[in-house]
């Protein structure tokens, strides 16, 4: 009985071994007939490789997107960030006060000369447009507070208080200043130029930045033009009167 059982076990083992060899043989023959790209093992490896590549590409894209966002963010930050520091504002305002005291003339009369005296004390390399724009904004900020009745003692922030004090020295409204500017502000030039598409507020602010010498030249030419207009009006009136007299004489 034991002998029979042993023979059966050996027979089954031989069958399993034979079947296993046959499967391996069939597998090898099948792989030989398959093209490399049709080999299941190659296909699986390629799929795994493609998957890894895709993951890498996705990772790169995400990284690039992240970098782009950072650059974009940084770019926006650099574009919109405040480039004039608190110290720069004080240097600029104090420089305007000192320039007028030392040179005996307003920085508006010699903007290039004024910029040369302070540009090395600013924390960045500012061009003339940046200087004039910053001066205009500081002036607008001061005048807004002034017109709203703000007093320097009511300003809690030390920087704001210092800026207000210096701005007051430079731009405190006076009757003399208002009289000097009245001829332009109240002239028809403002309305005429505004009709060309320039904002009146922008024009008035820009006019305040024009050197006094240039303003005087414009004012003199404007007066000459008004005199010529008055003379032309007088001649026109005289001419109409003569024509009217001729018509009256002819009807009589």
From Swiss-Prot:
InterPro entries assigned to the protein according to its UniProt record, in alphabetical order: GEBP, GeBP-like_C, GeBP-like_DBD
Organism expressing this protein natively: Arabidopsis thaliana (Mouse-ear cress)
Sequence similarity: Belongs to the GeBP family.
Keywords on record: Transcription, Transcription regulation
Keyword Hydrolase: no
Composition bias type Basic and acidic residues, residue spans: 28-57
Keyword Ribosomal protein: no
Pfam families in the record: GeBP-like_C, GeBP-like_DBD
GO biological process: regulation of DNA-templated transcription
Biased composition regions of type Basic residues, renumbered to the chain: 18-27
Region (Disordered): 18-57
Protein name: Probable transcription factor At2g01370
